[in-house]
Amino acid sequence: NSYIGNKDAYRRAMYQPRPKSNSEQINRLAKLALNYHPGEEWQYSAATSVVGHLVEIISGKSLDVFLKERIFNPLDMPDTHFYLDNTKGGRLTAQYTPGKDKKIILQDPGSERSRWVTAPRNIFSGSGGLVSTAIDYLKFQQMILNKGELNGVRILAPNTVSLMLENHTGNLPIWLTGPGTGFGLGYGVILDRGKSSSPLSEGSVYWGGAYCTISWIDREKDLVGLMMTQVRPYTHINIRRDFQVMTYQAIVD
């Protein structure tokens, strides 16, 4: 996670003008200077977009096709896509953003008018952009909790899952999640409950989405937590933490 030294240059490389393919976007990023050498700091970045494009190069398939064939179909996740056609677009909920005077503003109308239905279908980002359902994503998280297997279908080797859930950042500060946390391969990791002020057990992994979604895996409690909302930004509400606290308050043994 060593990208990117200049935020304006990073933004232009990612979005201005809108790239026509993953290859175009990543080639733009590759021309930028690093902010620091790998291992010196942790930074939230487009690192997994780079990984997603590497998957495309190695597999010879677009990322959407690769994920569908290797993960979504085997795990029976029929409602997880980068873009939706009209047959499923009607089920997509609207998205909101807080406005002035505590008013709620419609950000995306959902249904067939949503940008997830109408947008050009040429970018499949490893960093985000999937739409899904709680049931579908629960299957994925349960597979991780089960060390790579769900309903007799093995997606990952147990050692691979273990590697994903370990802290790979040492004592580097993770500014996005605060003290007492580290970062694995795609997940934040709770290292110290006291310092993190998290109700999750130490060793639990978690991450959230741009629209205030949150999910975590607590191996000590044999628990997967998942909450979906549709609001962005969400710094004015504590619903993600409140949901976690209430979940652990309900556990009596």
What is the meaning of each model-derived region?
Residues 100, 219-220:
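Short, ordered coil/turn segments that flank beta-strands lining enzyme active or ligand-binding pockets
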Residues 232-253:
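Generic C-terminus detector
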Residues 188-189, 216-218:
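Short, well-ordered beta-strand micro-motif
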Residues 214-216, 222-231:
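Short, well-ordered beta-strand elements
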